Amino acid sequence: MKLYNVKCESGARAVILDDMILTKDMPTTAGSKMLGGYMSLFDAEAVVRLASAGYSVAGKAAVGEFGIDLLGESSVDGALVKDGKIVNAAAEIVLCGEALAAVTLDVNGSTRRAAAQAGLVSVKPTYGTVSRFGTVPAACSGECVSVSAKSAADCLAVLSAISGHDDKDGTSLSESECKSALEGGEIKKVAIVEELDELCDGDVKAKIDAAASSLSAAGVSVEKISLPLITSARAAWNILMTAELCNNVSRYDGVKYGYRAENFLGLDELYTKSRTEAFGKLLKTAIIYGSETLSTENYMKVYDKALRVRRVIVEMLNKVFSEYGALLMPAVSKMAYAADGVALDECFVENVFTAPASISGMPSVVCGGVSLLGAAFSEGKLLALAEKI
């Protein structure tokens, strides 16, 4: 996988970006041949705010094609493999100390999976508290600009720098709401979701048990609860994500920008050949699925139903968070993915752990190999809780 280096030197306040975030002095490819060598005319709002806060961009790390895969294995540059396991480029750079933090676009949970397996802290904020202006659109109703670092304190510092209202983002929340999300506080009651705990292997269960023990020792009450509906978030999110992705990548037709096929007869053949040659297998699979979802025949019985499930999931979680401060859940099913053992569509199964946060827009913090899901605007509290794990 490529790492695009820039002029600034890495240092104590150096941040790595993933390749879904636009930068005017570096290529932005979204891990796809379709955007090979694409240069943006402007920086993303998150990049502008990082610079204003005194952070430097140490470079850009490649991502899986449009950020929908497990850890980046679908990138046009190929998977990044370490000791026979697939690893995430941005997470590895932070882990090696070459950057203080990684600022990434979390589309389908890859940022959180990477942090869990690398032993980093990662925060996916409440939807709308960080501007998405200047990010490559994939699944707009759930994707969030996220932060990963070695400590909760570093995550909070970088998140504070990029959070805030932005008039250029129509989904951006008010300044007061953005600030309230960063406020600390004590969470005294946490629940473990039995249905998700049963879907992971022994190593992940050991991480959950260790986190529960640490929280209990710190005076936090930990209980097990049953939430049968929570696994429905995966199916609903896959429907919404692929439908939105299908719509967003329709702009790449070989005419205005992006890859263009050389030999074609007519406009239709230009579209077909350009997309066939430039899109990868996983993205094509998602496009086909999304197209079928948005068809006249399936729109009401599939897409509309997924929107209804989203509302039910949000209502269920709000009810849970009226009693508990956070849910303690796995972030992955296993602590490593073998380079030769990952199915093409495994990302649509593995996201059962990350989909609840994606579809609900609620914040999630990964630490110690586990995930903490909280109510909207509770990321400050979740990061404080993470320090106890």
Residue ranges and their predicted role:
Residues M1-A44, R49-A51, A62-D69, T171-E183, ...:
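Short, well-ordered alpha-helical
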Residues L3-S10, K124-A206:
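A short helix-breaking turn/cap at a secondary-structure junction
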Residues P27-T28, I68-G72, R112-A118, G134-T135, ...:
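Short acidic, glycine/serine/threonine-rich loops at helix termini
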Residues M34-Y38, E143-K150, S291-S295, L372:
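Short, well-ordered beta-strand elements within core beta-sheets of diverse protein domains
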Residues D43, S52, I162, V222, ...:
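Glycine-rich, small-residue loops and helix-cap segments
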Residues D43-A44, A51-I162, S360-G368:
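Short glycine/serine-rich loop segments
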Residues Y55, P125-G128, K150-D154, S160-K168, ...:
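Generic secondary-structure signature for well-ordered alpha-helical cores
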Residues G170-C246, R251:
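Gly/Ser-rich, acidic/histidine-flanked active-site/gating loops
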